[in-house]
Amino acid sequence: NSYLNSIKHIEIEEATLTGSFASYFRDTGFPVLESVRIEQCNLSGVTSFARAFSTSTLQKVIIRDNDYPTAPSLLTMESMFSNANKLTELDLSGLDTSAVTTMRDMFSGCSALEELDLSHFDTSSVTNMNNMFGSSGKLEKMDVSNFDTSSVTDMSYMFANCTSLEELDVSNWDTSSVTNMYGTFVNCTSLEELDVSNFDISSVTEMTSMFRGCSVLEKLDVSNWDTSSVTNMQVMFQNCTSLEELDVSNFDTSSVTSMAHMFGGCTSLKELDVSNFNTGSVTNMAYMFQNCTALKSLYLDNFTTPKTMTDMFTGTTSLTYLFVSHNLRAFDGLANTSWYDEKNWVQLSNYAQLQTYHQQQSEPTGYRKGTFLSLTMDAMGGEFEDAEEQKVQNKVSGEYWDEIVPVKEGHYFDGWYLDRNFTNKFDFSLPATVSATLYAKWVENYTVVIPA
């Protein structure tokens, strides 16, 4: 044991290795081990490398130029390098991974690793990639573009907390067998582009936190996804703070039970079409749109009231229009300001009035933020084009009144005033702030006859 305690470097050449090497090079056996090199060996008989290099002292691992005279027996690489937090150099070009079924946690916690070349990996038999690269915080480059993921069922947390990863090409991945995408890209805070437009997610049931914290991602194309099997979408896009466009209009949400925090913190999102969402199975919508500070309108045509909707609209400070199903009976967190029914011009002075009013509706209703104002225009003996002597305009605070000019026989029009004494002339160039009555001022026309 004292001899093993002093070994820093292990080199294995021209040897035949067989059986399981699970946990073989860990710090429990080699407490000061810094490097391992396996070269020109026969690895056909190796069955497991699970946790083989999971050690905090290891800095370099080279496995290259090896032979496989017979079909490889290697089935598991689970946690092979997990928490090898000093590992900076890695060459796995001599591994035949064609029979491997699990790569779960394989590189998780490799917090010093900056580059990883896996372009030669045969992943055709792999079913589990859970947390495969999780918390490899310095990883900037990684080529996984040729991964055969046709057998993979679990991609949960696969790239979680890869905070330095700027590029990731998964555009050609076959995800038809995947059922779990919980946190697949969560907190990839440096990822600027991500093409998942061709993902087949028809078998996926779990999408919790899938893109949460992808804070520099500006675009994400999920428009053609078949989400009919998904049951959980909570926190799915939370804190995607740079996301300006997101088309979820075709999402089939009929099986979804939770949408809590789904879009929370998407502070750059100006438009979001969820009008086709079927929320009949949803029980939790808490914080669903929380702090979507740029969102101007929401169409919730098919929404129903869930059991939990705490602060669903909190922080939607730019929201000025809300079209709501009559089955959605509460608006938790909505700005406590004036709203009005755009169809019936009913003024609702605060949140409580809005909610009470909407609970009495039997059809979807559109509400606009603002105070409903009226401007009564008294022609004072004159008349408008339609022969009316009085005209009423309806506007909302912030809009502009129309300047309408009446006529009166024998007089010319001298403007609109806020008082009958004609001392306070009305300024149509200013936005509407209060309701008012205006009075037309007339000046009699005189005919002056000058004798010849």
Describe the predicted segments one by one.
Residues 16-24, 48, 52, 76, ...:
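Small-residue (G/S/T/A) turn/hinge positions that recur once per unit in extracellular repeat modules
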Residues 173, 225, 289, 339, ...:
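Signature tryptophan residues that serve as conserved aromatic anchors
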Residues 371-452:
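Secondary-structure capping and domain/repeat boundary segments
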Residues 82-83, 105-109, 131-135, 157-161, ...:
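Short beta-strand elements of solenoid repeat domains
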Residues 321-375, 415-417, 443:
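Extracellular/surface-exposed low-complexity segments
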Residues 14-28, 405, 433:
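Extracellular beta-strand-rich solenoid/capping regions of secreted or surface-exposed proteins
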Residues 5-17, 30-47, 56-75, 85-101, ...:
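Structural signature of tandem-repeat unit edges
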